[in-house]
Amino acid sequence: MNHLVTASMVALSVATPIAASVAAPGAPHDKLVVGMTAFSSSQHPYIDPVIVKSWTLGFVNRPVTYFTPDTWTNTCALCTELPSIENGRAKIETQANGKPGMSVHWTLKPDLKWGDGVPLTTKDIAYTAKVGGDPTTGFPDARIWGRIYKTDIIDDQNIVVHIDEVTPLFNRMSKLLSEHIDGPTYTAAKSPGDYVKQNAYNRAPTTPGLWNGPYMMTANDGASQIVLQPNPYWSGSKPYFKNIVIRSIGDTAALQANLLSGDIDMIPGDGNGLSLDQVLAMQKQHPTDFNYIFNDSVTFYHLDVNLDNPILKDPRVRRAMLMAIDRKAMSDRLVGGRYQLAATWVPPKEPMFAEGIPIVPYDPAGAKKLLQEAGWTPGPDGILRNAAGERFSIEYDTTTELKLGLLIQQVAQDQLKRVGIEATIKNEIQRTFFGDTLKRRKYGGLAQYFWLFSVSFAPLQLYAISNIPTEANGWGGSNYMDWKNDDFERALQASATDLDVGKQKADWAEMQKIYAQDLPTLPLFFVPQTHVIPVWLKGYVPAGMTDYASLRGEDWRAE
């Protein structure tokens, strides 16, 4: 699972009518001001990954490979050819310890340079692999960089990396660190944690030699604003804007006010921006002042089910709970039908999506029947009881900050009560909910939040048995449900090692089938990204996943 897995939700706010201030026709647009609600003080590509930073770095630090926005297909950004078994660039080999591994031959495009004119070479790949494989550096991307145990530099453009496992992720390579700028800091680090604090990206983020994209970071006040300007050594399409300003504005109400007043030009939907309901209200009030884009995404909104609770161990009970919730009505009434109902965690646009997995329908009568089959019958107060007289009463948790989530929770609570299930709301601030309650399984029944997935990334972190948080593993992993399904585990582990695309799809289809039957989480919706951009901005193509629209920032222009 993911490198940048984000667990958060969008907030509800009532849009206040404000007259929109837009530039006069013919006015020059050589500056683009982007507004977000968050800011990252760290600019290191891997340490402390957050959405706003990754979105910003799309302009200035290009990965070796990325997924295209239209078909979500892995493709080269800095390389000449995507390695594969078929073209001979990837091979299975035997490691010195006798275990199978892989060798992968990468070739960088010619004329790549950092922002100071120094050539970008295979030394930068080797350096990034070295830092990424060091457990003291704080890299979360262990399955991308940590699996590389050796690099063989052939020349400045060619390198062979050796991977300690057989994995379908062999031909993915993310952002590179600048060896000639950042390397001395890593070499000088004397104790664990020194590099995390002193790396060049955090100390001097406006150093030109840190960046290899169409833009460079030329100003960073460390609190609320970053300025990007064209990289004179960029070898690709010439970027249009002289300045791109990324500005952090405290909350969504202020963000919207700044947009309507003209202080900012746009709010991206793949960053920390406006909620769906805010954008819908704004579109109604200002239909022609901006372009509004709603695109499918990998954002999976769901309810984790605590399987430590004996009441919730029966799959029939979990299915009945999902049948009791009218997800379509929620989507229609709260967000104008923009939520896409989910059958599993895999969205239809995902290349590994399995056709034929039915979406559990809203069927309260069927839910009552299933609950009765599972041994639950109504008590005198209307709440179900089992043969031992135990009431069907569970806790229902989400975060206090997210207003639209609270509305969804209230509707679901009421609908569950109609079939005899008492769901007691127990909400917490995000820091407590994500930092303690989920991973220690302190929630008593249901936990409502969303995940943002990477494309075709085997969901080991979420569903592998080894990723059930425990005291023994330092409460690591995100299988917060304590889900143990041997059939799913076999398909999951196979999906993480099968190189044949056909076999991978079969593995994923099996996982989706088992998930839909067992329902360790209750799938609710896929949440679309909502982008508000100026009518004069062209070339803006949102992706709906973690390879953000900024990765094609050189194509943005004003017309």
Language-model segments: residues:
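Detector for C-terminal structural segments
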Residues: 30, 36-38, 51, 55, ...
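Alpha-helical secondary-structure segments
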Residues: 33-36, 121-128, 156-162, 213-214, ...
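Short helices/loops that flank or line small-molecule/ion binding pockets
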Residues: 117-119, 124, 253-264, 281, ...
